[in-house]
Amino acid sequence: MKNLLIYINPLKNFDSETAVLVKVQIDNLLSLGWKPKDIMIVTNFDYTYQDIKTLVLGDENYCQHHPTVSKIYTIITLLKKGLIKSEIYWLHDFDGYQLHPVTKKSFKLGNADFALTDYGRMPNWSTGSIFFKKSSKDIMEWIKQTTDKYHTDEETALSMLTRQNFQEINSRIKKLNISYNFQRFNLVSNYFAATKPIKNVHFHPSPDKVDFFMYGKNKLNKILLPKRLIRIFNKHGIK
C-alpha cells in the first residue's frame, strides 16, 4: 500500500497551514511504521523533510474552478505517466490524520476499484480519504469531466455519477466505514457507528477543532487523538 498526499499551488509553495501539516503528516506516518518509499507526496515544487522528497509535476494539474479537484487532475497525470503501480493507494488530505495502522492485510478493497466514506448521517461522498487502484483511471476521468463540465467540486461530481449509476460505476465503488475519515459532524451517531479503533480523523488545526479532538471538548467529553499524535502536533506548535 502507498500513502498519497497531493498539493498543487500556483504560488509553488505550501500555504502557512499546510507548511506545518506536511511535517505533521510525515512524522505521523513514519511513527506508524510507513516506510519512506511508500510515502508519496506530489507537489508542483521541490520540498524535502525527513529525507522524503516530493514528486514534482507541472502546474497544469491545478484546477482553477475548484482547487480541491487538483487531486483528481494529479492522479490522472500519475496514471498516464505510469506512476501508479499495481497496489492500493491511500489518498488523503493534509488535514486528515491516520491514528492507527492500516495494512493491506487488514484493509480489503475486494472487487472495488475505488473506496471512500460518506459523512455519516449525511449521505454525500467525502473525498478527503480515498483508497484506489490503477484500474480506477476511468472513474477519475469521469469525475474530472463532470467537474469541468459543471464547474463543481469532486464530491458533487462523484455524487452525480453514482446517483445515475453512470456506466455501472456503483458496482466498482466501496463505501467505507466512517472510521476511515472521521469528522466532527454528527459526532455521537458517527462515533458509535465507527469501527474502533478509529483509523483516520479529519480536521483543520484551528483552536476550536484542536479543543474538540485533542482536549475532548465535545459532546462525548472524549479525547479523540492518541498521545503519540498529540506529541507530534505539539512538536510542530499545535497545542
Language model regions located:
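Conserved hydrophobic/aromatic beta-strand scaffold that supports enzyme active sites
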Residues: 74, 114, 129-131, 175, ...
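GT-A fold catalytic core of metal-dependent nucleotide-sugar glycosyltransferases
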Residues: 54, 67-124
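N-terminal anchoring/stem segment of glycosyltransferases
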Residues: 1-67, 77-85, 134, 219-239
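Short, polar loop motifs at secondary-structure junctions
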Residues: 41-48, 98-103, 206
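Catalytic core and acceptor-binding pocket of nucleotide-sugar-dependent glycosyltransferases
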Residues: 137-238
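Conserved catalytic core of nucleotide-sugar-dependent glycosyltransferases
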Residues: 98-163
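A structural signal for well-ordered alpha-helical segments within the folded catalytic domains
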Residues: 20-23, 69-73, 152-160
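Short, charged, surface-exposed secondary-structure boundary motifs
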Residues: 63-69, 122-129, 210-213
